[in-house]
């Protein structure tokens, strides 16, 4: 029932950069199936990888702006809506090349039910997770906030800009989360890792990312 409520709630979100949910249904082996608009170009990372290198910077910046607009919208709602699971797989690209934020609410419910201070977050997503969400006392659970969305979006921007996962220098996601918990952040890669973005834009982008990754949540920028 809670999932149904979340789906109905998300159906009320009307923004050009939020993947529309058209309805819910049931089918074999799936008691609840969500019907969404079709995103013809798949997820953002795969889409960028399929472009010619000179095309990528402008397209990447467009996608980032699309998702920032979506986050500004949902965080500004009354009450605010928090995504809680931002990474490149949850950004889809439609036939027109627009970035669409998807899969929030439902993923958050699943994680609330399963994740504690002693649990392990699945799918490699610890690389994107704000440290306040896993620096917990035994038995505590997490609660995502607009500030933790900002942190995760910063990690996602780094991935889209360099086409490499956050904390690429760490062997695995546990090492990445340990580093983040100690206040460490991804090492700045050489300028050529950002493709054709250009040195001046890389400098501006990195300064923004450092603000988005601030260890203290209140020091992170709003969308």
Residue spans of the language-model regions?
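Regulatory alphaC helix of protein kinase catalytic domains
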Residues: 3, 7-8
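Short beta-strand micro-motifs within the conserved protein kinase catalytic domain, predominantly
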Residues: 20-32
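Conserved short submotifs of the Hanks-type protein kinase catalytic core
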Residues: 29-43
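Activation segment of protein kinase catalytic domains, centered on the conserved DFG
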Residues: 50-66
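Catalytic-loop of the protein kinase fold
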Residues: 75-93
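Activation segment/activation loop of eukaryotic-type protein kinase catalytic domains
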Residues: 89, 94-127, 134-138
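A conserved short helix/loop substructure at the end of the activation segment
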Residues: 213-223
């Amino acid at each position: 029932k809670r999932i149904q409520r979340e789906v109905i709630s998300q159906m009320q979100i009307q923004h050009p950069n939020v993947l529309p949910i058209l309805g819910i249904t049931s089918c074999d082996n799936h008691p609840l199936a969500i019907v969404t608009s079709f995103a013809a170009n798949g997820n953002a990372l795969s889409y960028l990888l399929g472009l010619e290198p000179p095309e990528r910077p402008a397209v990447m910046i467009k996608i980032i702006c699309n998702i920032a607009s979506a986050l500004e919208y949902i965080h500004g709602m009354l009450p605010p809506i928090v995504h809680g699971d931002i990474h490149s797989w949850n950004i889809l690209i439609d036939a027109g090349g627009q970035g669409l934020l998807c899969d929030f609410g439902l993923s958050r419910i699943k994680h609330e039910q399963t994740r504690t201070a002693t649990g392990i977050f699945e799918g490699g997503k610890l690389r994107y997770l704000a440290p306040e969400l896993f620096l917990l006392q035994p038995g505590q659970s997490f609660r995502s906030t607009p500030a933790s969305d900002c942190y995760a979006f910063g990690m996602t921007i780094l991935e889209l800009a360099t086409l490499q996962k956050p904390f690429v220098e760490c062997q695995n996601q546990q090492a990445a989360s340990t580093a983040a918990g100690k206040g460490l952040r991804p090492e700045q890669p050489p300028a050529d890792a950002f493709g054709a973005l250009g040195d001046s834009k890389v400098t501006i982008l990195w300064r923004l990312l450092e603000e988005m990754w601030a260890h203290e949540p209140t020091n992170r920028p709003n969308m």
